[in-house]
């Protein structure tokens, strides 16, 4: 399953300014395009559907719901994905491709259960204490689970080196979300905030469903060796803690500021600091170029050189090993 390295190499081999721009654009498309697609979709919906005409409290409820959906779906997926990624790497190396579907099924079950463990009590609090409409609460819950499944499916598509399809699936899901939101607001005259949340939820679910179908099309055989997957969680429990703490470190500063005077509380449930959260979002944008450059260099140079080094270690001479290592 070819990655993007071969295509990037062909682009950069032309050695022209236009080729460099094309290579950078292609790298951007397959690395950070999904994030920009979601952000762009929310901005377009806000602009064309009259988001600014909605009351401040309703806008705060929508912002808090979307913010929590993104942050906590990523945090919930983090502990399991590290171990599952290790398991996937091992079985791919051993060429036991029939063990991939059991890994997918176990991970899917664990992510949903773990997500519900935290989301259901939160939603109950949102409904009872925050007096938020039950339909709105349930839609937010479905959006959280759907995005959780999207992040989980991205693990398998990334291992398959199918970065282009990840971007394409996000584009399809968000295009459907924008179209549905436009239809609900402009044609059926439904509530703007709920229409946007419902449309985003359906868009995330569509992205997750297409991703799952693609994974199933890649790996058709199922060994049903589910215990082997669970055994890895016992062996590599430290990966669970490491990846959770790493992901938590990305947002812990936000959580700290949510306890300061900058915080805003919506519906006695959602707590966030809009000023600081916006500042960290803008700061994140300044680092996107490094992400693109890193992925490009890994895809174009690291994989092939690491493969050559591994082959030299297995059956090469000492000189071959040293030469491969120095590269």
Predicted regions span which residues?
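Alpha-helical transmembrane segments of multi-pass membrane proteins
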Residues: 67-72, 109-113, 121-153, 327
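Specific pore-lining/lateral-gate transmembrane helices of multi-pass inner-membrane transport
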Residues: 94-104, 277-327
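Transmembrane helical elements of multi-pass membrane transporters/channels
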Residues: 199-299
């Amino acid at each position: 399953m070819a990655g993007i390295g071969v295509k990037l190499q062909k682009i950069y081999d032309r050695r022209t300014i236009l080729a460099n721009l094309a290579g950078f654009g292609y790298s951007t498309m397959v690395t950070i395009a999904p994030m920009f697609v979601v952000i762009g979709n929310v901005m377009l919906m806000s602009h064309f559907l009259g988001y600014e005409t909605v009351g401040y409290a309703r806008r705060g409820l929508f912002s808090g719901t979307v913010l929590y959906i993104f942050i906590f779906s990523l945090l919930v997926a983090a502990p399991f994905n590290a171990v599952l990624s290790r398991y996937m790497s091992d079985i791919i190396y051993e060429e036991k491709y029939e063990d991939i579907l059991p890994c997918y099924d176990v991970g899917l079950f664990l992510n949903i259960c773990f997500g519900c463990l935290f989301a259901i009590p939160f939603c109950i609090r949102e409904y009872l204490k925050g007096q938020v409409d039950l339909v709105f609460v349930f839609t937010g819950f479905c959006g959280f689970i759907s995005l959780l499944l999207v992040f989980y499916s991205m693990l398998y598509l990334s291992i398959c080196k199918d970065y282009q399809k990840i971007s394409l699936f996000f584009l399809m899901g968000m295009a459907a979300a924008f179209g549905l939101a436009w239809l609900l607001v402009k044609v059926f005259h439904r509530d703007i905030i709920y229409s946007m949340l419902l449309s985003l939820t359906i868009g995330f679910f569509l992205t997750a469903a297409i991703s799952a179908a693609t994974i199933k099309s890649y790996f058709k055989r199922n060994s049903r060796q589910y215990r082997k997957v669970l055994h890895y969680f016992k062996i590599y429990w430290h990966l669970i803690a490491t990846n959770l703490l790493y992901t938590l470190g990305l947002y812990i500063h936000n959580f700290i500021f949510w306890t300061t005077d900058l915080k805003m509380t919506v519906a006695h449930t959602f707590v966030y600091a809009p000023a600081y959260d916006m500042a960290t979002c803008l700061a994140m944008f300044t680092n996107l170029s490094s992400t693109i450059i890193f992925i490009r260099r890994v895809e174009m140079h690291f994989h092939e050189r690491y493969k050559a080094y591994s082959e030299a270690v297995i059956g090469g001479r000492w000189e071959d090993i040293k030469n491969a290592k120095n590269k």
